[in-house]
């Protein structure tokens, strides 16, 4: 019997609505239920589309305004208010000339730091409520100029490190970038393993100063936030020459302090050391490992970059700097905190009037964020949850959940509506036709639109249905039928009623034959690389389409993506279908439980089979090392999976950590490691060497992947057995014995405190002199003794030592002590100027066989320091040389010394040279080019060149006559202001310049074209290469 309430009669519909809309997207009840809400339901509260952003305004900005953006989507359109530091801004016309609002955006004209810096928020409102934007901080940026005070020069010995201080001027914000200029703008110094600029302090660090570092340095500072750059006064860096560069241990000068960073950000840690040789820098995390794929090291180790920080990246980081003289370490703690981030946000919701509702939001962050709620822009409640009971119209409005910690504030916005409505199936009727398989299960859904929640009843035809062993009416109103048969076919009606009305909806049920698997897939056993086959046959209702779905261990096989290994065949007939799955070139990952599911639109059934895949073994586990000696270790491991084929043997491999070698098979005891073993001794190792080990298993089906490497292990120390090679030497300074060698490679140190013992003696002397060299990378030792006779034969041998003892001596080598420096000085016989910039000096050679060459030094008297003199080296076979690069009209002093490998002998007497005045600077002015009446010559004429007071007197003119495009031509000289030149066929250039005792002056050039035959050149004419290039 149909309930009385649902007999046909007039029905009253009453509707009252409140609504909740997310700020991130528009959600309108009226879009889904226009009949329920009518025209008014198209309205909704403000939803932010743009919010104001933090702004840094440059104090020197030419654009004298700041714009803060605020834009919402709302219906009706929202009105806008602005707050500064939580105080309402008066934005009426004429109230404050600095502020104006346009379409929600706040414009600040002629910004003033004292008035307009602070935190701004935008409030958007309409009839449905108000929402408040995130806070936007307005700050004023500046970067002052550097002080105009001169910077003091920095004097550093070559080989030592240097630090040039930047001392940036006052600025805001703190974020600056630094570079250094050398001598002039914009010559920025390149950064490399030896030079580093700290982006924290701006200081320039040079690990090892060289003579080429001499120059003037300026710190160049840029503020990206305000697009401004300034640079300091230049700092002179003066390297002080050392006869031999000393070595200095690594000394870390750039040390990143303990620092804080936010989750997801990138951070860079700095570390740079002074020292000679240039230190090597390495990084490690002391309480963990450097994050794989999220870290990078640059600038030869000076910078450690950590990307997309996670909380587990917090910890203690250490940089190590070392060279052959020593090591240094620095530790810094990195703390990772997080700005608020939503774990759960308030969501859109429609709630029945009088009902209960919980509005909840959860935020993560470090420190833990404080959470509170706003309603229509005002404080509503603290905590992460608001509980409503017996909702009423007064609960309507715009709600915001706000999470805040010291790193930021986030908002989640929503609009609340509560509604009341009679039941309606207009937009969600009962499914009109439902199919069910015999002996199966079906569910009719009944979900009318109604508030308060309606009472639900069901009928079949005119029969009212009740819960039984086969029939269930769920709490949500759905009707479930179990173990169905043909007698269950028919029409089913859902009735819904609440205090505002009633409604019903009807659907029909039809019964089909059940689907059955008649041939299930069979178990299979294959080896890796072989093929496997699974077959499945099913019967089904002829009126329904059947599909087969294959899955492996519960996961559907993607036949398109895995087409390399999976192929499927299907056959269909009336009421029966089959499917065959072919697995080609099987791999270990293909093993498992395969399921065939036969499925129609009404029902499905499944059958399964196991596929076993046998293959090479997996990697051994837990590789570790014990019983370490100087040349052996014991390696232990645990068996990995044998992949259903017994392990026959193990192979142990090793590599040296420092050498970054490829893995190689290790020599073991026993030589052949059986498949049931879990340890082996690795032999023939080098002492005091760091190794890694790994193990590989093999069975009859192949060799498996290697294990993870063992922890790095260093063998014990032992006495060295390798001596230095290529022992030689000789030469050097007087009264010295210079010994050279090729150092022992580091893998043969065999222990700490490695060095060399050198034994040497005159060839026929029975007494050996022994010295110790503690630098393992040293290649030379110079023994100084005033008693050493020159050019004497010495016998030398060497051996290595370490903390465990001394090694064997090398074979003896024979070298000679240094010869004496020349004892006599050359005698200068002539020193005279050739031009304004060149001179010649001639001397009487020193008649000693030990002279190898001569050094000529010259410098400007009373102007240049003798130490800065220009130097020319000349072979001992020469007794004269040409001096160039001299200054015109200047007094020079010149001296000559004989020298050899032992040094320089005494200087000759000093001679004076006075260079000529400069050649004429003005070129001749060519005034005419006239063809001779015969056509065989041409006359070139020019004005006389007058010398200036500081220039040499003109003695004549030089004329170069050459074919265009040729590097040489015919040179003429004349004292006149004109010259006749033979006319030749083709295009020619004529170059004219004045000549004086100071040299040749500036050139004038004219181009001529002739048609006469080109005569042969007279033998008396001189061919010269092209030297003049100036064209007037």
Curated annotation (Swiss-Prot):
Residue span(s) of domain Ig-like C2-type: 46-139, 144-231, 249-335, 340-417, 423-510, 515-612
What membrane topology was assigned to this protein in its record? Lipid-anchor; GPI-anchor
What PANTHER family does this protein's entry cite?
A: CONTACTIN-1, PROTEIN SIDEKICK
What species is this protein from? Danio rerio (Zebrafish)
Prosegment location in residue numbers = 1011-1032
Record's protein name: Contactin-1a
Q: Which residues are glycosylated?
A: 119, 216, 266, 455, 467, 483, 504, 604, 879, 950
Region Disordered, as annotated, extends over 699-729, 907-926
Q: What UniProt keywords are attached to this protein's entry?
A: Cell adhesion, Cell membrane, Disulfide bond, Glycoprotein, GPI-anchor, Immunoglobulin domain, Lipoprotein, Membrane, Repeat, Signal
Please give the tissue specificity annotation from the record for this chain: Expressed in brain.
Q: Which InterPro entries match?
A: FN3_dom, FN3_sf, Ig-like_dom, Ig-like_dom_sf, Ig-like_fold, Ig_I-set, Ig_sub, Ig_sub2
């Amino acid at each position: 019997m149909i309930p009385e309430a649902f007999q046909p009669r007039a029905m009253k519909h009453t509707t009252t609505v409140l609504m909740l809309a997310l700020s991130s997207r528009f959600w309108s009840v009226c879009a889904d239920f226009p009949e329920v809400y009518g025209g008014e339901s198209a309205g909704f509260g403000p939803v932010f589309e743009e919010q104001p952003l933090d702004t840094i305004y440059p104090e020197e900005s030419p654009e004298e305004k700041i714009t803060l953006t605020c834009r919402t989507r709302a219906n009706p359109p929202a009105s806008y208010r602005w707050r500064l530091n939580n105080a309402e801004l008066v934005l009426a016309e004429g109230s404050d000339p600095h502020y104006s609002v346009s379409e929600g955006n706040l414009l600040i004209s002629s910004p003033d730091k004292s008035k307009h810096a602070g935190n701004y928020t935008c409030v958007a409102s309409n009839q449905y409520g108000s929402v408040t934007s995130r806070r936007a901080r307005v700050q004023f940026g500046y970067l002052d100029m550097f002080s105009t005070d001169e910077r003091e020069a920095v004097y550093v010995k070559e080989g030592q490190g240097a630090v040039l201080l930047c001392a940036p001027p006052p600025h805001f914000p703190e974020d600056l970038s630094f570079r250094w200029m050398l001598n002039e703008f914009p010559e920025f110094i390149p950064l490399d393993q030896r030079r580093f600029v700290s982006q924290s302090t701006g200081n320039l660090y040079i690990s090892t100063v060289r003579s080429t570092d001499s120059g003037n340095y300026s710190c160049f500072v840029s503020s990206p936030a305000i697009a401004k750059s300034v640079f300091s006064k230049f700092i002179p860096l003066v390297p002080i020459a050392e006869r031999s560069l000393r070595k200095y241990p690594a000394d870390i000068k750039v040390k990143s302090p303990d620092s804080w960073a936010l989750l997801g950000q990138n951070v860079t840690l700095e570390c740079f050391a002074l020292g000679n040789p240039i230190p090597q820098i390495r990084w490690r995390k002391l309480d963990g490992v450097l994050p794989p794929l999220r870290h990078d090291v640059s600038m030869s180790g000076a910078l450690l970059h950590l990307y997309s920080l996670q909380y587990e990246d917090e910890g203690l980081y250490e940089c190590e700097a070392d060279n052959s003289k020593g090591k240094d370490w620095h530790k810094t703690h990195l703390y990772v905190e997080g700005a608020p981030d939503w774990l759960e946000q308030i969501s859109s919701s429609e709630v029945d009037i009088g009902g209960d509702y919980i509005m909840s939001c959860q935020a993560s962050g470090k420190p833990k964020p404080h959470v509170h709620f706003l309603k229509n822009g005002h404080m509503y409640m603290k905590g992460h949850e608001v509980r409503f009971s017996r909702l009423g119209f007064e609960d309507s409005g715009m709600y915001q959940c706000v999470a805040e910690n010291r790193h930021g504030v986030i908002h989640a916005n929503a609009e609340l509506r509560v509604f009341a409505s009679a039941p309606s199936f207009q937009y969600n009727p009962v499914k009109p036709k439902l199919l069910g398989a015999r002996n199966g299960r079906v569910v009719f859904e009944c979900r009318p639109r109604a508030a308060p929640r309606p009472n639900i009843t069901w009928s079949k035809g005119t029969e009212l249905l009740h819960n039984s062993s086969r029939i269930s009416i769920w709490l949500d109103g759905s009707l479930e039928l179990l173990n169905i048969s043909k007698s269950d076919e028919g029409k089913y009606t859902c009735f819904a009623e609440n205090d505002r009305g009633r409604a019903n909806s009807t659907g029909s049920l039809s019964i089909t034959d059940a689907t059955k698997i008649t041939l299930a897939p069979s178990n299979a056993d294959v080896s890796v690389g072989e093929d496997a086959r699974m077959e499945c046959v099913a019967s089904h209702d002829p009126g329904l389409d059947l599909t087969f779905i294959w899955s492996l261990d519960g996961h559907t096989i993607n036949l398109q993506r895995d087409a390399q290994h999976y192929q499927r065949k299907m056959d269909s007939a009336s009421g029966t279908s089959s499917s065959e799955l072919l697995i080609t070139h099987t791999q270990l990952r293909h093993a498992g439980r395969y399921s065939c599911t036969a499925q129609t639109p009404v029902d499905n059934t499944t059958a399964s089979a196991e596929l076993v895949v046998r293959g090479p073994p997996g990697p051994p586990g837990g590789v570790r090392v014990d019983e370490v000696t100087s040349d052996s270790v014991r390696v232990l491991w645990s068996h990995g999976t044998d992949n259903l084929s017994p392990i026959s043997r193990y192979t142990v491999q090793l590599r040296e950590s420092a050498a970054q070698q490829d893995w190689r098979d290790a020599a073991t005891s026993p030589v052949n490691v059986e498949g049931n073993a879990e340890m082996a001794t690795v032999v023939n190792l080098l002492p005091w060497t760091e190794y890694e080990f790994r193990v590989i298993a093999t069975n009859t089906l192949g060799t498996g992947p290697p294990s993870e490497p063992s922890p790095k292990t260093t063998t014990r120390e032992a006495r060295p057995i390798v001596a230095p090679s290529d022992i030689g030497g000789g030469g050097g300074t007087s009264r010295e014995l210079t010994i050279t060698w090729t150092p022992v490679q580091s893998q043969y140190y065999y222990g700490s405190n490695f060095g060399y013992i050198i034994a040497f003696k005159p060839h026929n002397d029975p007494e050996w002199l022994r010295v110790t060299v503690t630098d393992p990378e040293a290649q030379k030792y110079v023994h100084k003794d005033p008693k050493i006779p020159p050019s004497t034969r010495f016998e030398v041998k060497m051996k290595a030592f370490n903390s465990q003892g001394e090694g064997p001596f090398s074979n003896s080598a024979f070298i000679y002590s240094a010869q004496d420096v020349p004892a006599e000085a050359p005698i200068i016989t002539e020193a005279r100027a050739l031009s304004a910039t060149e001179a010649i000096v001639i001397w009487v050679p020193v008649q000693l066989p030990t002279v190898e060459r001569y050094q000529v030094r010259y410098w400007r008297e009373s102007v240049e320091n003798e130490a800065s003199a220009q130097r020319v080296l000349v072979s001992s076979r020469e007794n004269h040389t040409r001096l160039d690069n001299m200054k015109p009209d200047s007094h020079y002093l010149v001296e000559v010394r004989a020298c050899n490998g032992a040094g320089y002998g005494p200087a000759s007497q000093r001679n004076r040279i006075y260079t000529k005045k400069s050649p004429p600077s003005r070129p001749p002015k060519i005034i005419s080019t006239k063809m001779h009446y015969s056509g065989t010559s041409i006359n070139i004429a020019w004005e006389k060149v007058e010398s200036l007071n500081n220039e040499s007197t003109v003695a004549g003119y030089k004329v170069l006559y050459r074919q265009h495009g040729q590097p040489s031509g015919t040179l003429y000289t004349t004292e006149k202001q004109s010259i006749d030149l033979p006319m030749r066929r083709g295009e020619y250039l004529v170059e004219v310049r004045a000549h004086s005792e100071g040299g040749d002056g500036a050139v004038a050039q004219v181009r001529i074209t002739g048609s006469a035959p080109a005569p042969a050149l007279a033998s008396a004419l001189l061919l010269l290469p092209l030297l003049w290039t100036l064209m007037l």
